[in-house]
Each structure stands twice: as C-alpha cells, then as structure tokens.
Amino acid sequence: MPKFPQFRLILVLFYLISMIQWSVITFSLGFFLNVCIFAYFVFFKSLPDLPKPQPRFVDIVPESSNTVDVDKELKSVEGLIQDGNAQIGKELESIVNLIIKDFVQPWFTKIDKNSDAEFLKVIKWRLLQTLLVVKDKLMKNDSASLIVLKLLPIFNKHFSTFCDAREAVLSDLTLERHKSANIDLQIAVEFNKNYKIHKSLSLKPNALQKEIEKSIRKTVIGLLPHLFDNDELDSLLVFTLMTEVLTTCIISPLIFKFTDPDSWNLRIVSLSQNYFEEKHKVHKIRRMLSKELQDHRKVMNDVANKDVGEPSSEKLELNAEYTGKQFEHYLNQLDSLLDLSDIKYVAYSLALKIYQLKENEHLTKENLKYKKRLLLSLNLIESKLSFPGSEIDTASKKLAREANYPDLNMDNGIVLKEMASFLTSITLKDIVDDSEFLPFFESFLGSVPETQGSTFLEYSQTIESFKNPLEDATSEDIISGYSGISTMQLQEISSKFFHNNNLQNMKLLDEGLVKNIILFRNSFQINNDEDTFILARKSVLLLQTEAIKYLDDRFLPLFKKTPSFLKMLSTSHIISTDIYAHFLSRIGGVNNPEQNKIIKDNVKTDFMNPVRIFANPGITDALDNIVNGSGSKPHKSRISSNPRYSQLFGSENDNIFKDKLFDDENDNTSEISVVEDQLDHPRNMEKVSVSSGNSGLNPSQFYGSNNFRDNIASLTISIDQIEKELELLRHLILKADLTNNQMQLKILKKSQRTLLKELEMKELLKQQYMVQENGNSLFRKTKIYIRSYFSENSSNGLKEITYYIINIHHFNNGQVSSWDMARRYNEFFELNTYLKKNFRDLMRQLQDLFPSKVKMSLKYHVTKTLLYEERKQKLEKYLRELLSISEICEDNIFRRFLTDPTPFKLNKEYMHDDILEEPLHEPIGSSNSTSNSSSVVDLQSSEDGGELNFYEDERHFFTDSGYPFYSQNKSFVKQICDLFISLFALNKANAGWLRGRAIITVLQQLLGSTIEKYIKVSIQKLRSEDQVFEAIVTFKNMLWGDNGLFERKRNETAEATRSEGERLRTEQLALTSLQRLFADTCGRVVGLRDSHEAAGRVHAMLQNPYLNASLLLEALDAILLDIICND
C-alpha cells in the first residue's frame, strides 16, 4: 500500500494541472473523482468504524434480564398501589392503563405492534411508582393548613381584587362601549394593575389555552425531578414522554375544563338542583318517620291483640342461599316472634353463624352479603331483647348516635360480645361429658399429627369408666376396694397404655407416675402386694388428672379455632344442653312468664320497634316513592330559607315536640314575606333574619330558673325523640346497604347527618342551660383554650378592635361539648373588676396574672402583634386559674361570661346579689346561636371517673390524643373570617350589625361547629378512603367516561357544539341557581339581599376565563410547592 504523504502530493499536483489545462467539464469530472478517492483513503482506511445509531428510548428497557425483572417489579408495585384499599388501587391502575392506551400505544404500535411489549410494562411500572411517590407525599401533608392558610388567602385576595376591578370597569364603561367592549378582558387588565395575574398569562387574544399549556409544561418539567430518579430522566424519551403525559393527559384537561365559564355554569346548575332535591327528600323522610311514630296505635291494633303463644317447635334459620324475597319473609318472621326462648335461640344461632364467617379472612361476595344479612338480623333481634334499662337498651341508644352505620361492623353488639365470652368459657368437661359433642372433639384429635391427644382422651375416659366417683387421687384415704376385678383393670390399663408409642406419650405427663405403674405390672406375678396396688392405682388417677390438664391447656384452644367447634355448637341438640342454658343466662336469664309479658307489652307500646319498622312494606314503598321523586315537590313560596329546619315533622298541629324553643316559624310563608318586605332596608332585614328564630321564647325570661328547668325538660324530650328516629333510620340505612340500593342509601345518609347535627345542637344547648342553671356545673368540668384572636376596624374606622376566641369544653354525663366565645379585652377587664370586688380574698393571688392595660406613653411604641400574643397567653392562664376556684365557678356572672355570646357589660352600681337579678339578653338566634356551633364528643366513661380524668388529663384537648384538630399551633379563624367578610362585602360602611363577635357567631351557625374543628373534621372526611375513591372515580369519568373529555374529542365531529344562546341561557340559570343556593344556606344570618349580591359576585368571577386561568395556575403552583416540592 503506498504511503499517504506521497499520494497526497501527487493528488495536489494533479489537481493544479487539471485546473490549468482542462476544460470546464473535464475539470468538474476530475474534481469529483479526486474527492471520492481522497475521502476513501482518508476516512475509511485511517479512521475506525462508527457504531450504528440507536433510538435513545431503548435505554429505559433493560438490556438483559440480569439488570431488573420488569414483570417482578411491576407486580410488586401493583401490590403496593393496592395496599390499604384495593378499590382505590384498582382505579388508579385503571387510569394508568388508560393513559398508556391513549398516549403511548398509538405511536409505539408503529415501532412494535405487540400489546404486551416490555416497553409498555416499563412505562406502567414508572407511572405506578410516580403515584406511590405522590401518595406518600400526600399522606405526610397537612391538608388543612394547605387549604386554609395558603389556598384560602389566594382565593380571598383574588376575589376581593376582582370585585374592585369589576366595579371600576363597569362604572367607567359607557353604554356604547359596553356593547362592543370585551368586558372580561377589560376586567382582567384592571385586575392586573392591582394584583398581577399569573406570570405565564399575557392576555393576548386567542392565546389563552396555548399559554396555559406552556405554563403547565414548564411546571411539570420542574416537578419531574421530585417524582423520578435522575437516571431515568437522563433518557430523553422518558423525560419527554413523562412531561407530555402529565401535561396533556392529566393537568391540562382539568385546567381547561375549569377555565371555561360554561363548565362552571353547568356544574352550578347541577349542584343546585341536586341540593334542593336532596333537601326536599330529607324533609319527606323526616315526615315519614314522624308519621310512623304518631300513627303507631293504629298500625299496631292487630299486633296488640296477639297472644303470646307457646315456643315454636320450628326454629328460624337464615340460609346463605336466600333470595331477597325470602330474606324479607325471614325478617317478617322475626317480627312475629313473641316467645323469649325463640328470640334467644335465633340470637344464639345468628351470633354463631357470624363467628363461623369471621374465621374466614377472605370472604366471597356471596358470603360477604350473607354476613351482612346475619348482622342485620342479629341487630333486629337485639332490639326485641332490649328491655327498658337493660344493657342492650343502653347500648342501642349509644349506637344510635354513631354515624358509621353502613359499615355493618357491629362486633360491638351485646349478643356478639356475650357470644365471644361464652365461647371462651366452654370447658373440656362440657364437651367430654356430652355424648353428642364428644365425637367432634375426637375427630379433631384424630386429624392432628400429634398422637398424644387421642391417647390422653382415651386414657381419661377409660379411667373414668371404672373409678369410684368418691375416689380422690390427692387424698391419702383412697377407697380402693382391693379385689381381683380392680387388679385386672389395672393390668389391662397397664398393657394398653404403657407399651410402645403409648408409653412414650404417657411419659410426657409424669415419668415417675409411669414408673410406679410399670413396677406394679412387673411385680404383679411375683408379689401380689396391696401397697404396690394402691400406689399404682393412685398413680393411674393422678395421670388422669394430668391428661385432662394437658388436653385442656394444649388441644382445647386449638379445637376452638377450628370450624368443627362452631359446627358442634350448631347442632339441634344444643338447646337441651347445659352449655346453651349457660348462654341464655348471659343474655338476660332463662325464659319465664314475666319476661314474655314484657315482650308482649313492648310489642303493644314500643312504637319505635325497629324490627316492625324494618319489615313494614309501607315504609319500603314510601322510601321508594321519595327516592324516585314521585309525589309533589314543594312550592317555591313554601321553601324555607333555613336549610336545617322546615316543618320536618309533619303537620303543624301534631305537636310532637311541646317545646317552642326549637320550633321554626309557625308559618314559613309569612316569614319569607316579612323578610322580602325588608329588601329595601338591609339593616332591618338582617335583624329580622337572625331574630326570627326566637319567636317561641321571651328574652326577658330567658334566665329565669323555672324557665331553665322547662327548657332542659323540653330538650330532654326532643333529644329522646331524635335518638329514636336515629335508631329507625339506622335500620333503614342497613337495609339499603344490604340490598345495594345506592339511591336510598345516599338520601338516608344525608337524613342521618341532618338528625345527628340537630341532636348535637340540642345536646349542646341543653348543656349550656345546665351550666347557667346549676352552680356546680363548671368546677372540674370545664376547660378553656384561647388559640387565636381576630381584629377588625370599628364601624367609624377610628380604631382597631380585637376579639379573643375562647374555646370552651364542658364535660357532663360522659359527654364533652365544645363551643367558641368571642370576647374583647375590655370585657375581660370588666369581669376581672367584678371578681376583685366580690371575691377579694380569692382574687388576691391572681392579681399578677391579669394583663394590665397599655400606658398611653407606650401606646405607639408597642408592637400590636406581640401585645395581642402576650394578652392571649395571659388571658388563657387567667381563665384556667378562675376555673380551678369552686366559689368563682358557682358565680352566675362568670358562667354568663362563658356561655352568653352577647356583649358582656355590667352595671357597676349593682353589688353581687343585685347583678344576679338583672335580666340578661338572649343569645343571637337562640337555638341557632353559639349553641349551634357546638360539637359533642362521647367519652364513653362513667360520670365520676370520667370527670376526674377529664379535669386531670391536661393533654385531653390540647394534643392529638383527644382532639387531633388542635394538634398544631395554627389558627384558621382569621382566614375564614376574612373570606366571609370579602364574600358578603362586610368591610363596607353599611355592613350594619354583622361585625366583630357577630361574625364569629354567624360563622358558627353556618358551619354548625367551632370554626377550627369544622375545618379539620371536614378535611379529614375528604381524606377518608370513601371520599378519595369517589374523587378518583369522578376524575376518571370526567376524562374517560361516556361523556368525558377524551371521549368527546373522539366524537367531536358527531357532537353538536353548544350554541351561544344555550350558553347564555345556562349562564342566567346558573346565576339564579347560585342566588337561590346562597339564600337557602346563608339568608337567615346575612339576609337575602346580601346573599343574592354575594352569589352574583361569585358568579361574575367565574365568567371570566382569564382570571379563572390565573387563579387555577396560582393555586396549582401553591399545591405542588407544598405537597411535592416541599423537600
């Protein structure tokens, strides 16, 4: 091969000669030829071969099976995603499969048509891993703080700025400009001057969606390092694919949907319709329950004439194969049971079958349904055994308060508890002494690998068959009766049980006793000695005792865990045994005529009998009619503006409740007409709307001692009535869940929540009355905590007023009630002055605890925040010290300070006794006052012990152990109040009486609980598995459902787009629906006009797509920063 330098020189010379001598064509051909030759030698002979190019996405698929087993990893992550709740895991996996189907397979099938390709498995694996990361971060996130402390201020500022911008634009536009101008864009521009829209939006025409998607893509790019490993993101395809999937498949569709005003309008209309339909159905259900209670005498005429018959020879049995009709017939048979022995046998049989199913951890769908039927039937039977004052009766009342009826997790039932104790109490002697039960135990011993069990049982029975009943192996005086027969028996026992394998088993009991018997056997032929015989016989009896103990300690517990044990107790022979008699004694004693008479009397008088109500076909038909919407709907003029109460108990003349404290207005129509007459006078209107609930109570007599007792008595009757209704409703919910009637279940649960809310409010009001009426109601029964304060400007705007929010927790009769009280520093100061005047000696030790007033010389040199924080801590400590002094706790004025939400002001001319005679004013809204802002928590403890633990356990309310919603030192009151003020424009000069402490009171009326508790508990409910599952299903249907976003895109050619006229009609309908919704929920406390105006402002804000996009993107940034990128 020639040397390259010489060759290159020849080429250069040749090239120069060609340039000079050849023609243009010859030159071109020569040049091309020379270049080809030059390239061949230089590049292909002197440089190494380049590798063949590969697509970069192959890097995410393992090159060999040694790197990672994709199938194994995928199976593992699928198991982790379903850990905790299989339903949620399956829905998430289904969404991942849909993402791959819609966004990966369409282009990947052009490379590989195999639907089971390893690349698709890797993508699924990575997406599921991402969901696990998100799940872990969500579990660690404080959702309440995120929503209230971060998202709520964003929305509040956005809403306030929008209202100002809208007012400025509309006041500036003339009529001509108004017709042609883009109002939404004008408002967005004005909004941008004051608050700045999201940085990614430019407000350019027709660029909104592109800018939204660009912003989301940029956000996702910053998000990926928190969801994936860096090694995975090094692959360009992984990075690009994950970015596009998260952007175009998950986040962008949601933002686009809620940016469109028409989507909001449709959702508002749907929400409003569903709300009022459900509210109407709830009212009808309450009327139906009330009617059943009122008409019980007529319904029970036939039942009252029944005579208690003899015990039925045919026992009722519920089989797993029963159809729905057969199960209904079985329930009717349960209702007809009047003999106590029959009732108790059914209770025994049902409880035993439930325990049989509990042994199986993985029940089939059929067995799960069967278990629910068994639980329901047992619950109904317990109601028939519930005599007044009995343990079952007390437990039933307590269970009626609980809100988790549909779970059917009723292992706390009295019969089930007694059954568990009964099964534990069954002894080996009970089984061995019964010829019907013994074969089950023998069969079990024969099935286990250890042979000593069968040997010991046979040995014990053999000894029992020949020993004298009076013989005692532990006594020195053994009645042996020396004879040839006894000697032969010992010889037979020795030859049968003390040879070969049996000998080894017997040595496990006592090797020394075994040696005594072997010694007797060996010496029997040689020396027939009586002493040796007695020793052997005593050893035989002692070994029997050891054998029984061995069986009892080792084999009986194992036998009780097998299906054979429960099968043994399920035989028909059981009712004639001592074991069954022992069970009957546990659940109320043996059958007797007196208890049968009680059963019959209960049938006649107990119109709340849930068995009868449950089996009543009339109630079933009525529920079907209510749920299916049959029957007339209420006229608009008759719809009360109060969402909680409105003729819920039938006719006005029925007088189910005798107390007028809780009556809604006698005529809702007249109430609405009065309120509507005040539309032109907003201040009067608000006063009417709040005080209208007080018509049944004379304020001047509110604090009379006799009136307190009357109110407490009326409340007791009302609470008892509600508890009975809850008991009935509980069985209806169980039946709806059992029959899988989801429509009934939904409306019944809503009715249950309404009843529970009303029950809590009345119980709280009862406790507040008891605090006012009883001088011993505070000491060692009350705790307080000042978590926050709330400031606002006075009505004239000259000074700032601060209210300290006192959280009060009161213990009474095993229950803890909590409410909030807003007090100014001046009110604390007036209380302190009063107490120092009337309790001089007691207050001397507390004079240094009360925070002093700020001196005028220091007024402008003290930071307000530090001042308020210091006062908050000192006032809390001061109140706690007051509650530790019994004499002060007995003072009426001090009790009023903690229970009456009206301004606390005393006439300083009066002394202690005279002040007590001063009539106090009724709290705002009476039954809708702060008492409605309560929560009642059952401590499930005895009164004395519970009160002692409540008082001494300082951690009960101030740590996670008692109230998890008070776990962090963060207050939500200010954010909620600010939002309420912005929503209803209460910061204006004409806001009227609704300021300061009234805002706190009104908010608690609307929320039905203390503010912070309501927020925490509501968010905890949203984080529950049921709510999470429902949200995931809704998200899935929104994008991939029959009418989902992607499905509509596929069929957009066939789908008719909504016309401008349809959109306008929906917009107007949404406005009226939202106004009606606001008026119904808030009209009674803020007035109809303010409710309508607030609804109009919210509706107008949702009609601006630019600001919708800005708000959603800002909220998205805050959510991702707090949840995903917080590390």
UniProtKB/Swiss-Prot annotation:
Protein species of origin: Saccharomyces cerevisiae (strain ATCC 204508 / S288c)
CDD domains: PX_MDM1p
Protein name per the record: Structural protein MDM1
SMART domains: PX, PXA
Annotated gene: MDM1
Residue ranges of the TM segments: none
Primary location: cytoplasm
UniProt similarity note: Belongs to the sorting nexin family.
UniProt-annotated location(s): Cytoplasm
GO molecular function: phosphatidylinositol binding; phosphatidylinositol-3-phosphate binding
InterPro entries: Phox_assoc (IPR003114), PX_dom (IPR001683), PX_dom_sf (IPR036871), Sorting_nexin_C (IPR013937)
